């Protein structure tokens, strides 16, 4: 498969895995291992990265194996998002940041105005910027025009497991994209992840679908395989849909039985 390129980074895996809500560190580590994800995302606000006495994910991981993608979850405006991003960078983490500015507490949908503003501010600060956005086609284009390094449209509300509720909009975002499109939020099953990849997405970021599964380790492996299968299917190019049947067996050269 073709590698996933984000800014100066290249990755074999197209699965980006969130690290929250796992039952314990052991299950989390095993799920990460079997997923073969190379990018791990986490909320800076949920982790006291400056307190050596506070156990956290970074102590348990061989961080040299992964690219860490801190996110600005909890930010309500652009200024808060920038402040969180700078905190992550000051701690020595990767300067790649997932911009997450929530505008509605019920749906957890992003604030489009503040997301645009935060992305612009962080680009000026030299960050590699990956904004979480809705499936708004125009907003995705405006973010792209700013110079962000990837677009991360949600398939459906965060943690809902509803899958891709608006494949048409998602396909429009993918068709106009000049940067990677990583489907983020709402994925519930391996079929959802495969569908996103078949639409032409460059990657899938998920968390709850794995951490909330009855068997997170098996689900992590299932997601890995479904994303690989979906991408291979996209690269292979599926047959055209037709209204009528087409025989799959050749008719030429067949003997006629009387």
Curated annotation (Swiss-Prot):
Q: Please provide the Gene Ontology terms (biological process) for this protein.
A: thiamine biosynthetic process; thiamine diphosphate biosynthetic process
Q: Main site of residence?
A: cytoplasm
As recorded in UniProt, its EC number(s) are 2.8.1.10
Keywords, alphabetical: Cytoplasm, Schiff base, Thiamine biosynthesis, Transferase
| GO MF entry, a single one | thiazole synthase activity
Q: Which residues bind 1-deoxy-D-xylulose 5-phosphate?
A: 159, 185-186, 207-208
Q: In which pathway does it act?
A: Cofactor biosynthesis; thiamine diphosphate biosynthesis
Q: Catalysed reaction per UniProt?
A: [ThiS sulfur-carrier protein]-C-terminal-Gly-aminoethanethioate + 2-iminoacetate + 1-deoxy-D-xylulose 5-phosphate = [ThiS sulfur-carrier protein]-C-terminal Gly-Gly + 2-[(2R,5Z)-2-carboxy-4-methylthiazol-5(2H)-ylidene]ethyl phosphate + 2 H2O + H(+)
Q: Known Pfam families for this protein? A: ThiG
Residues annotated as catalytic? 98 (schiff-base intermediate with dxp)
Highest taxon of source: Bacteria
Q: Where does the record say this protein resides?
A: Cytoplasm
Which EC class is the enzyme in?
A: transferase
- Where is it found, in Gene Ontology cellular component terms? 2-iminoacetate synthase complex; cytoplasm
HAMAP family of this UniProt entry? ThiG
**What function is annotated for this protein?**
Catalyzes the rearrangement of 1-deoxy-D-xylulose 5-phosphate (DXP) to produce the thiazole phosphate moiety of thiamine. Sulfur is provided by the thiocarboxylate moiety of the carrier protein ThiS. In vitro, sulfur can be provided by H(2)S.
**Family listed:** Belongs to the ThiG family.
Quote the subunit structure annotation.
Homotetramer. Forms heterodimers with either ThiH or ThiS.
**Name of this chain's protein:** Thiazole synthase
